Amino acid sequence: MKITINQASEFVGKEVTIGAWLANKRSSGKIAFLQLRDGTGFMQGVVVKAEVGDDIFATAKALTQETSLYVTGTINEDTRSPFGYEMAVSSVEVISESHDYPITPKEHGTEFLMDHRHLWLRSNRQHAIMKIRNEIIRASYEFFNKEGFLKIDPPILTGSAPEGTTELFHTKYFEEDAFLSQSGQLYMEAAAMAFGKVFSFGPTFRAEKSKTRRHLIEFWMIEPEMAFYKLEDSLQVQENYVAFLVKAVLDNCRLELDRLGRDVSHLEKMVAPFPRITYTEAIERLHELGFDDIVWGDDFGAPHETAIADSFEKPVFITHYPKAIKPFYMPEDPENDQVVLCADMIAPEGYGEIIGGSERIHDLETLQARMEDFDLDQEAYSWYLDLARYGSVPHSGFGLGLERTVAWISGTEHVRETIPFPRLLNRLYP
């Protein structure tokens, strides 16, 4: 019977066949240990010469790294194994040999590994990170479905940029100009006026010339929008959502976290509610910490976010940023017209902003005035202005960056490892 490695617990004491790749191998004169990988997990296969005979043992000893094969044998429990089970191999059938596999068990530099990203994905570490990424995606759908959100797919090609920025990828759309989407937010606002609570999950593209460990050119975002939600309502959704993601990974990816050496004691503290401070309070805190380079009205850089987050064990919301450094669609605070009703969620341990969100302006005249302040072409946004013309309501939304969230929860230093094929400032291959 053919099974996968993650089914091994169901077949203890039985003879089965597994299709796999050889991740690694070690052998002595009379026994060979095969580390097998099939995409669902890893398992050790033990080949004993006295039990399988000379021919099968010779085949096993000659196997090269990443050769694909069928292995047949009996599944046994093994508490010494990191996988919990191993196979007593009775036969080996080679499917396709692998010659001179470039990523050997020795250490390799990052650029070399990125050049071979299509092969690096096969490694134990990358397998663990991708499993955690998948769990975060799965749990996101579970959370929003349970909360009554409708999944909406906004366009990737757009005729305008939601934040009025120049950091756009331009392309031709037949005879018109088009851009790769930086965010589906404006379209999600339209969907919220139709369906109440909606969310999207898809790629976004930002032509930022950044080389930091937090930035990708192409990344994925979860973007919910909620009609009749004020800022505090949205913050409660955000903290419950992030706490739900962390718990899902702790519950379902413990082996992967262990494999990555992640200290889960940090993650086990991620229970809502999360602390909140205003932008002004954050500036004061930074001055107390010796950051004299920043003044009220400046945006935060990575060192500032890290210093603020270090004061808390959980993610922290920074709310009420200056109006001048935030996008046009954010409403002023009724009690202070110099700040807007918004918040960024800053992850602990130096991982920076993982969520940005705000209330949205729903008054037509106010929205038009803000667009004039930003020198935006109102004709290009006429459809968006229609939302305020025809029965708009107070509403809020946010965007969670998937790769930064994966990096934080998995303890991965650089976001380039949190997406299968990263697009960086200097990398469009493979």
Swiss-Prot record:
Lipoprotein keyword on record: no
Transmembrane segments: none
Alphabetical UniProt keywords: Aminoacyl-tRNA synthetase, ATP-binding, Cytoplasm, Ligase, Nucleotide-binding, Protein biosynthesis
Catalysed conversion reaction: tRNA(Asn) + L-asparagine + ATP = L-asparaginyl-tRNA(Asn) + AMP + diphosphate + H(+)
InterPro entries to which the protein is assigned, alphabetical: Aa-tRNA-synt_II, aa-tRNA-synth_II, aa-tRNA-synth_II/BPL/LPL, Asn-tRNA-ligase, Asp/Asn-tRNA-synth_IIb, NA-bd_OB-fold, NA-bd_OB_tRNA
Family: Belongs to the class-II aminoacyl-tRNA synthetase family.
Binding partners and assembly: Homodimer.
Protein name per Swiss-Prot or TrEMBL: Asparagine--tRNA ligase
Native source species: Listeria monocytogenes serovar 1/2a (strain ATCC BAA-679 / EGD-e)
Lineage, uppermost ranks: Bacteria, Bacillati, Bacillota, Bacilli, Bacillales
Gene field: asnS
